[in-house]
Amino acid sequence: MHDSFFDLIPSAPAEERVINEHPHLYPLPSRERRLRFNALPMKVIDAAILAIIMVAVVTSAVRAEKIRTAIPQANLNYLSIFVADAKGFFRDEGLENETVVISGPLSIAALLSGDIDYSGAGGSGMRAALKGAPVKGIMFQADKVTFYLVADPSVKTASDLKGKKIAIGSPGDTQDRVMTMFAERGGVSAKDIIRISMGSDTSTRVMAIKTGAANATTVDPGGLVFAQREGLHSLGFLGDLFPMPFQGFVTSEKKIRDNPGQIKRWLKGAIRGLMAVREKPEESVDLGIKKLQLGNATRAMIVEGTKNYLRAVSQPVPGLPSTEGIRNFLEYDIKIPMQIKEDIPPERLLYLQLVEEVKKEIEAGQRRTNR
């Protein structure tokens, strides 16, 4: 019984073992030794090569760490995670990732229980952190909100929103606040807007505009394509109002304390996924289209929506928000909705040192490649 595949190879004579152990004594292989090697049966050589390959594969599989990444929705905002899975970016980092769809609050509960490792419910996670939950934000996919404002023909500019009915998800949510800022920059007071809560379903709000129940609403990149095909027009990309990082990912403080190396490897895989979507949106859609839950959207619509989304992703290496962006995020996504007056130190909710390191490493690799 052989202990390993390598036992199939005949033992070398004593002379050969000495040569192998002390090659400096025999700087050039003798003709006899060459002939002796060449005389080995091909089956033996093939078995040895196969053994080496199998050992490498098994070793790689054993070393891969199993992790779970939760995203709140299987929409275009998280296409990059599916692309990172499909292209093996997490696997390249020694991680065997499983992507699951879990809504915000449930996702944070799963993170705290250890059932998942990373959560894309960044807003929910950081608001929970403010209440004492041991989680922190570790990256943001986008530097800006990804919303567009669409309207019926009666609304052509921000000033036209005065007295109009705006379909929103819920009062005070991120879309409501950003839409209000857009109106205020057009000289319209927040009090002059009529808000109608209709929930998060984009098609419901778009159809409300078509039936006259509302005049305008905010939509995500995929929703913009749907709205335009229904005859609505876009007043603009709300992400251009000001930098405010969006779609944050969080992990547990325990993970940060005990396994920062894994976090860096996960970040590298996730960021490479974002960069792949930006560089090849059509190919990325083809890779992720079976995972996305986008109803009856065609491939062309999804590609167009993906390009709309990419306006919010920073160049050249995404993931790390600007100082101004962090300040805006804390103000508009944390303090205002939670009615907090005192300042919030960023480090209370965020741990961005690791994504900063990963960003520098990727940039250094790009510079070496471009030389």
Describe the function of each predicted region.
Residues M1-H2, E15-R17, P23, R31-F37, ...:
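A cross-taxon signal for low-complexity, glycine/charged-rich
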Residues D46-V57:
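Bacterial N-terminal signal peptides
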Residues V58-A64:
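Sec/Tat signal peptide C-region and signal peptidase I cleavage site
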Residues E65-D201, R205-T211, N215-P221, S234-L238, ...:
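Short, glycine-/small- and polar/acidic-enriched structural segments
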Residues G123-S124, R195, S203-N296:
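Pocket-lining segment of extracytoplasmic ligand-binding domains
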Residues D258-E342:
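Secondary-structure end/capping motifs
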Residues L330-R371:
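Conserved C-terminal helix/tail region of periplasmic/extracytoplasmic solute-binding proteins
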